[in-house]
C-alpha cells in the first residue's frame, strides 16, 4: 500500500524527493500518512479536493481487494 501511494504521489508533484509516506498498522486497519513539499500540496489535494479524493479511492479499492481497512491522511 505504501509503495502505491508513493508511486502515485511522486508522479503528481514537482519535488518527488520530498514525498514521504509512513504506514501504521494497528491490527484492525492501516493508517497511511502522505507528506509532500509545501509547494506541491495544491497538486496533491487538487481543485476542490478532487485529486485527493481520487487518490483515496484508488487506495481504498486496493485495500478492499486485500480485505483491509485503510485511512489515508495528507499532512503538511
From Swiss-Prot:
GO BP field: cell wall organization; peptidoglycan biosynthetic process; regulation of cell shape
Family stated for the protein in its record: Belongs to the KhpA RNA-binding protein family.
Single GO MF descriptor: RNA binding
Stored Gene3D superfamilies: 3.30.300.20
PANTHER family: RNA-BINDING PROTEIN KHPA, UPF0109 PROTEIN SCO5592
Highest taxon, organism lineage: Bacteria
UniProt key word Translocase: no
Localization: Cytoplasm
Name of the gene this protein is made from: khpA
InterPro entries recorded: KH_dom-like_a/b, KH_sf_prok-type, KhpA
An example Gene Ontology CC term for this record: cytoplasm
Residue ranges constituting the KH domain according to the UniProt record: 29-76
rRNA-binding as UniProt keyword: no
Keywords, ordered alphabetically: Cell shape, Cell wall biogenesis/degradation, Chaperone, Cytoplasm, RNA-binding
Name recorded for this polypeptide: RNA-binding protein KhpA
Quaternary context: Forms a complex with KhpB.
Function, as annotated: A probable RNA chaperone. Forms a complex with KhpB which binds to cellular RNA and controls its expression. Plays a role in peptidoglycan (PG) homeostasis and cell length regulation.
Amino acid at each position: 500500500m505504501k509503495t502505491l501511494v508513493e508511486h502515485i504521489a511522486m508522479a503528481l508533484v514537482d519535488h518527488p524527493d520530498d514525498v514521504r509516506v509512513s504506514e501504521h498498522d494497528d491490527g484492525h486497519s492501516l493508517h497511511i500518512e502522505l507528506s509532500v513539499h509545501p509547494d506541491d500540496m495544491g497538486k496533491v489535494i487538487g481543485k476542490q479536493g478532487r485529486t485527493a479524493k481520487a487518490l483515496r479511492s484508488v487506495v481504498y479499492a486496493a485495500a478492499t481487494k486485500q480485505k483491509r481497512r485503510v485511512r489515508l491522511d495528507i499532512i503538511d
